[in-house]
Amino acid sequence: TLLDVGSGPATISLALAQKLKNVYALDYSTEMLNYANENAKANGIENARFICGDASDAAFQLEKEGLKPDCVILDPPRKGCGEELVKTISRMSPSRVVYVSCDPATLARDLKFFTENGYTPKEITPCDMFSGTSHVESVALIERN
């Protein structure tokens, strides 16, 4: 089971859906999740659930429902995840978290929150997606201790 937080049109999670039991995609944009739903239907993907709303609130609700994902993908806006979302995800106990960040400062802050909640960053890969600018994307692999 995969939880995709900040999924946008769920490109990553839908690409993996056929190899997974269930996919939960969270995003604040109804428009993006409509695209995700259309994409799932067009590709015959029936094991995906799309949830619109604030990431922290939606993740907390899924935790209350008993969701225990094997892996979480995080792709937050520039402000990062924040402590409450990290705590909620940590309580769900995924073995791995893949964090896609567009801000090294908020990534560093959120990695600190993960380490305080039983996780260890294993690998961080910077990606120059916007050549010639100061912007850098980073992908961090975080594992439960």
Regions found by a protein language model. Name each.
Residues 1-145:
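Rossmann-like S-adenosyl-L-methionine
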